[in-house]
Amino acid sequence: MRVRYKPWAEDYLKNHPDLVDMDGAHAGKMSEWFEKEQPIYIEIGSGMGQFITTLAAQYPEINFVSMEREKSVMYKVLDKTKEMGLKNLKMICNDAIELNEYFKDKEISRIYLNFSDPWPKKRHAKRRLTYHTYLALYKQILKDDGEIHFKTDNRGLFAFSIESMSQFGMYFTKMNLNLHDEDDEDNIVTEYEKKFSEKGSRIYRMEAKFHKCFE
């Protein structure tokens, strides 16, 4: 998704009450940003925020974190959060490679990866959010029974992710090769998903966990 630069976005984000600061004072203490201590789910690459705000509204018993690196997009999520009166959703404006600056080990119950940039060129594989470098970060912050929910319209990225996760010691608990041809009442459609499914694009989805290590 190409984002149009908005020069005023950075000033808008500064000191916003729903945006987690980056001074490190709260690193590993994400629960302190919320009114209640509840399980934490995060979405990496939230875009315009339709998915994460819908989830937060449906599940008040869960705390949600939206992680988006584009300041020119993040303000939309902040606006939706305020309009909907969501007390269980906070935002981080940073790259996923910095995850362990915000979350301590085994703090997160679920990670959502929705329509991540496929980085189709082979030399850019390490930038994909299912590359082993990122999987190592996810394993570090996820609880032992934590999950990764992944959704894409890119067949190449889906195949790469299956291979990458398998090689990293993960297993799949659910897999959809054509999501919109199946009756999945729990599916929340993102802006991107709606646009491309209406054009006939196939949507791929899977849920995965890390194997537990036994001594």
UniProtKB/Swiss-Prot annotation:
The active site is at D117. Belongs to the class I-like SAM-binding methyltransferase superfamily. TrmB family. GO terms for cellular component: tRNA methyltransferase complex. Pathway: tRNA modification; N(7)-methylguanine-tRNA biosynthesis. InterPro entries: SAM-dependent_MTases_sf, tRNA_(Gua-N-7)_MeTrfase_Trmb, tRNA_methyltr_TrmB_bact. Keywords: Methyltransferase, S-adenosyl-L-methionine, Transferase, tRNA processing. Catalyzes the formation of N(7)-methylguanine at position 46 (m7G46) in tRNA. This is tRNA (guanine-N(7)-)-methyltransferase. NCBIfam families: PRK00121.2-2, tRNA (guanosine(46)-N7)-methyltransferase TrmB. The keyword tRNA processing applies. Substrate binds at K121, D153, T190, E191, Y192, E193. It catalyses: guanosine(46) in tRNA + S-adenosyl-L-methionine = N(7)-methylguanosine(46) in tRNA + S-adenosyl-L-homocysteine. PROSITE patterns: SAM_MT_TRMB (PS51625). The gene is trmB. S-adenosyl-L-methionine binds at E43, E68, D95, D117. Signal peptide: none annotated. Its EC number is 2.1.1.33. GO terms for molecular function: tRNA (guanine(46)-N7)-methyltransferase activity. The lineage of its organism: Bacteria, Bacillati, Bacillota, Bacilli, Bacillales.
